[in-house]
């Protein structure tokens, strides 16, 4: 009998083609290594990407184009940098993640009042992307269009907290009840659905209620630094053997624990014998390895609002996540701009080290959590802005 495979809610990034002079990335690309391609060429402040330990400039590890479902005008990308100094290989603040956004112009917001203007605006916005083939177009049967995260083309958008096309399939989340952060994000999603009847209301929803920061008046030039070899990533949905869907997880979801809603699996953490058992910690790593084995060349896992795949339960981060299930303090700070909780969004996987040809790195996974409200950072005259997000690192 042939093995049956089941689709999960996670998107995976696989090595596609190397970056070259003939095939260069743009701001809508997702890739490892190389140099970042910022919106409108507006660089961030280089001081942001200095290693917190040695103060040297970090190298780009990943650029991920990550627009959110329901916000067709706001453009968004995540950038991850890492220090290449051997003495910083196990230093927590040697990895930096920045969320970059480009907000719509006032003329674009006004344009959505007219149906004809909407059509024209969408054509104008999509035309630059169509000039060359998107190397990240998903080839699975569930994909539609070039943008795998487009809310209008796919019900399987990983940026939505409810992306399961099969209601009968059990949730892959270890927590059976939603957290405060998940509720907040779901509330926004629900409002977007109910207000999607008019584009004007939709724009008001995504732009109102946000903190207004002083504009950025300085301009910056991205420094010429050494870089890792570049590789485009192709995105596809994750598939796992059907018999693994219901397997019990031992990983934790710090980012979904802002309320005391816990399922039965958390009770085991309260038992001292469980806490001290090395076999439990080993099981966390076994689950990590097993999940990777189904798609061994994955370099990126993306599931905004989902559950991170932990490599260990006994390192500092794993212990902190465990303490949260016992009502301890979360290691994930609130967004400094709007004070909202952060959501898990993505993680870099071990195979990325091989693709980057990074002989220094020793991490097992790099977790990224971002503002659950996706608040607007300070922006410049081109309406481009950057916000530093949370990074959690687990080492070998």
From Swiss-Prot:
It comes from the Eukaryota. The keyword Cell membrane does not apply. It is found in: Cytoplasm; Nucleus, Nucleolus. Pfam families: PDCD2_C. One of its GO terms (biological process) is maturation of SSU-rRNA. InterPro entries: PDCD2_C. Keywords: Cytoplasm, Nucleus, rRNA processing. Its main location: cytoplasm. One of its GO terms (cellular component) is cytoplasm. Belongs to the TSR4 family. PANTHER family: 20S RRNA ACCUMULATION PROTEIN 4. Required for processing of the 20S pre-rRNA at site D to generate mature 18S rRNA. This is Probable 20S rRNA accumulation protein 4. The lineage of its organism: Eukaryota, Fungi, Dikarya, Ascomycota, Taphrinomycotina.
């Amino acid at each position: 009998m042939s093995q049956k495979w089941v689709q999960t809610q996670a998107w995976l990034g696989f090595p596609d083609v190397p970056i070259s002079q003939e095939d260069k990335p743009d701001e809508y690309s997702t890739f490892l290594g190389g140099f970042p391609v910022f919106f409108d060429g507006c660089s961030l402040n280089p001081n942001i990407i200095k290693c917190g330990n040695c103060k040297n400039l970090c190298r780009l590890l990943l650029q991920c184009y990550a627009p959110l479902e329901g916000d067709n005008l706001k453009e968004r990308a995540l950038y991850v940098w890492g220090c290449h100094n051997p003495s910083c290989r196990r230093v927590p603040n040697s990895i930096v993640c920045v969320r970059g956004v480009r907000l719509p112009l006032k003329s674009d917001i006004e344009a959505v009042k007219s149906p004809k203007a909407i059509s024209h605006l969408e054509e104008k916005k999509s035309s630059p992307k169509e000039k060359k083939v998107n190397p990240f177009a998903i080839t699975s049967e569930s994909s539609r269009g070039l943008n795998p995260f487009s809310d209008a083309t796919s019900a399987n958008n990983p940026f939505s907290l409810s992306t399961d096309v099969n209601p009968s399939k059990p949730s892959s989340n270890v927590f059976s009840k939603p957290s405060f952060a998940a509720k907040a994000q779901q509330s926004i999603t629900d409002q977007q659905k109910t207000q999607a009847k008019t584009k004007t209301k939709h724009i008001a929803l995504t732009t109102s209620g946000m903190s207004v920061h002083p504009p950025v008046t300085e301009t910056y030039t991205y420094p010429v630094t050494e870089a890792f070899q570049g590789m485009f990533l192709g995105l596809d949905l994750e598939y796992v053997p059907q018999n693994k869907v219901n397997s019990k997880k031992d990983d934790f979801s710090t980012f979904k624990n802002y309320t005391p809603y816990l399922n039965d699996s958390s009770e085991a953490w309260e038992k001292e014998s469980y806490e001290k058992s090395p076999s439990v910690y080993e099981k966390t790593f076994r689950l990590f390895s097993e999940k990777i084995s189904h798609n061994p060349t994955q370099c990126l896992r993306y599931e905004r609002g989902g559950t991170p795949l932990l490599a260990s339960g006994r390192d500092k981060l794993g212990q902190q996540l465990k303490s949260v299930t016992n009502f301890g303090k979360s290691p994930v700070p609130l967004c400094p701009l709007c004070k909202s909780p952060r959501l898990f969004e993505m993680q870099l996987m071990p195979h990325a080290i091989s693709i980057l040809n990074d002989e220094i790195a020793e991490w097992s996974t790099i977790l990224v959590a971002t503002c659950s409200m996706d608040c607007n950072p300070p922006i410049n005259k081109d309406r481009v802005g950057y916000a530093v997000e949370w990074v959690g690192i687990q080492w070998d």
